[in-house]
Amino acid sequence: MPTTEAILAVLRRLVWESADILRAYARSEQPPFGYPPALSVDHGGEGPVSAADLAVNQHLLDGFRSAFPDAPWALLSEETAAEQLTAGEPLDAEWLWILDPLDGTKDFLQGTGEYAVHLALVHNQRPVLGVVLQPEREEVWFGLVDEQKAWCETRDGTQRPAQLSSRVQRSDLVLVASRNHRDERLERLLEALALGDTKAIGSVGGKVATILRGETDVYISLSGRSAPKDWDMAAPEAVLLAAGGAFSHADGAPLLYNDGDVRQAGCLIASNGKAQAELCELARACLAEIDPGFAV
C-alpha cells in the first residue's frame, strides 16, 4: 500500500491539473493536456454530462493508474460506473477510490462557479481519505479520517485547518441547501427543524466546504424520485468526519459505500456535529408524519 504522503503528493498534482482543465472549459479556452476544446454536452441519463466531466475523468483515471500501477485498490468513477457495476453486486475491492470528476455539472454549465471534484478512498465500505477540489476558489480540502485531520490547501501549498462553527442551538444553525432538488417534504422537514439562516450553494462538496469554513452548520439530503450516489457523498463525508463533524442517516446509521447499491437514499444529515443527535431525532419524528414508511 502506498504511504499517505505518496498518495497526497499525487493527489495534489492531479487535482490542480483537473482544476486547470475545468477552468479552461468554463472560460471557453483550450484545455491543457490535449483535451478537445469544444464543451459538448450530453443531456441524457440522470443529468448532463459534458466534455469537461469526461476529460477530468480520463485525467484522474490515467493519473492514478500511472502513479500507482501496483496499488491494491480499484477505481470507480461516476462516468464509468455504468460499465463497471452490476446491479446489486459490490465491486470486489477492499480498497476503492470513488471519483466524481465534476460534481455540480449544472452549476458548471450555468457559470455559477459552484462546482467541485470529489475523490475518496474507501476501505471496507467506509471512507478513510477525502478530497474536495473547488477550482473557482482555488482551494482543495483534504481529510484523513483516522488521523482526525482536515485542512484546506491552495496552489502554493498554504494550508489552514478546518474551522467548524461552535453554534449549537437549532435556531442559530445555518442551513446550506441546493437551489434545486427541493420538494414539499423537504420544505416541511426544514420548517419543523426551525433552523436559522439558509445559504444556497451548488455541489455537495461545495456545501460541505461551507461547513468546514464555519459559514454554515447543516446540510440535509432527502431522496425522492432520485437519490445522490456514492460519488456525491464519499469525499465530502470523509473530509467532514476528519474535521470532527458528523454525517449520517437520520436514524444514526452510517453511510455505506460499495454495498451493491450506489444510491445514497434516505434522509442524510451532515453537520458541525454539535446538534447532530437532536437533528436526527427531530427529522425521524417529522418524516414519520409527513412520509410514513420512508426509510431514513
For each feature predicted by the language model, list its residue ranges.
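Residue-level signal for inorganic ion chemistry
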Residues: 22, 53, 64, 105, ...
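Short helix-loop capping/hinge motifs at secondary-structure junctions, enriched
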Residues: 149-152, 157-159, 274-280
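N-terminal subdomain of lithium-sensitive/metallo-dependent phosphomonoesterases centered on the IMPase/IPPase/PAP
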Residues: 1-102, 188, 275, 288-296
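DPxDG-like acidic metal-binding loop motif
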Residues: 87-155
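Short secondary-structure junctions
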Residues: 30-41, 149-150, 194-201
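An extended, acidic
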Residues: 163-296
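Acidic active-site catalytic centers that drive phospho-/nucleotidyl reactions
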Residues: 53, 78, 100-103, 107, ...
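Conserved acidic residues
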Residues: 73, 94-96, 128, 173, ...
